[in-house]
Amino acid sequence: MKPLRLLIPAVILFAPAFADKKEEVKFSPEPVQSYPSKQTNENVTIAVKAYDTEDLAHTAFGKLHPYQYGILPVLVIVQNDTNETLALDRINIKYSDFNGQQIDATPAADVPFTVEGPRRPSAGGDGNPIPPELRKKHKNPLGGPEIQTRAFAAKMLPPHDSAYGFFYFQAHYRPGDSIYINRIRRAGSGKELFYFDIPFKE
């Protein structure tokens, strides 16, 4: 019976680890041509999709729903059907709303600091007279790793390949808004592709 008593605690100890693995969300988008909101320039196709609902957010971020906290994730898929490598390291993307206002993307590392509570640390301190160890700690709803791991990070895109990831905007989504993208270059010549202006169709 002793081996049995030793086995039970071991199973209990390992159970949380297995539970955590089950909660991991694997994300893979559909082929670029399957998205209604897309545009093709010079044999390069870009598709975009706003993740504004809880169901959509669940497929990419698990329990996290960024739009609930004022952050709109926009999935961007780039399909390179040219015979040249594309440089994406200077890609510029803006959200154009129904009023014509252009909103810059919020860097993934800055997203947690857009909600009330945490402040980005600075060399001069944060101005709060209460010592950090005495402050009441609140869990940041946007402080998990999903925001950064899902962010668009590709710097180069080989021929006949695709890259995808999320850009984050402090914007209110409406169908008819659009995504403006430029500064995609041909790596060999440095020539910039024509800009993309992609309206949301859903």
Tell where the protein language model's regions lie, with residue ranges:
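Hydrophobic h-region of N-terminal signal peptides that target proteins for export
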Residues: A10-F18
